[in-house]
C-alpha cells in the first residue's frame, strides 16, 4: 500500500511531500533518532543482482533527496543512516561513506550499522567468527566515520551460499511470497550463537543496540533476545 502511494505521485515535489509527512509522523512520538535507509534496487535487480545504478549514483541521489526534506527534522533529533547490501551506503568503501556525509547539509547525523546487512555484502563468510572479524575490520577501515556509528541492528546473516547458488533470474510467478522468500533468504535476521559478540560491541561501542530478529511470537522473541544478550558477555 505504501508503495502505491509513492507511485501515485506525479511529480518530484509531491513525492518529497510524502517523505516529509512520514518524517512528521515519526516525530510525533518524540524519538531520539530517526533511521534512513540509503539504497536503491528494483524488483528485477533483487533477483538478478545486475544493478543499473552504482553506489556513487545512489549516494548522490540520496543526498539530494535528504537535503530537500531535512529542514523538517529538529536539530536535537539525530538521523542515523542504515547500510544495506544493495547499491548505496554499504559501508564497504570508505570513499563512498565520505562522499555521502560530506554532501549532507544537516549536522546531527550518523550511522545505524546493521550487522546482517553488512554480512550480506561478503558472500565468502562461512561462520560467525569470520563475520565478526569482517564487521570489525570494515568498521576500522571507515577511519573517522567509525565514530559516526551511534546504533547497531544486531542479527546474523550467513547467506553467501544462497547468494552464490541463486538462479539470478526473476521467477515466472513473481508473487509477494516469492519476493519475500528470496529477500529473507539473503537477509536472514538470525541470532548469533557463538562467542565473539563482546569483541564486536567493544569495537563499535553503539549508544543504541537493537536485536533485529525474525520471530513468530513474542515468547519466541524473548528467548531469542535473551540468548543473544548472553553472548554479549562472552
Indicate residue ranges for each PLM-predicted region.
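Short, small-residue-biased leader/transition segments that mark boundaries at the very start
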Residues: 1-6
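Active-site acidic/histidine proton-transfer and metal-coordination neighborhood
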Residues: 8-110
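Histidine-acidic metal/acid-base catalytic patches
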Residues: 16, 30, 107-113, 119-234
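Short, active-site-adjacent cap segments at secondary-structure transitions
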Residues: 42, 118-119
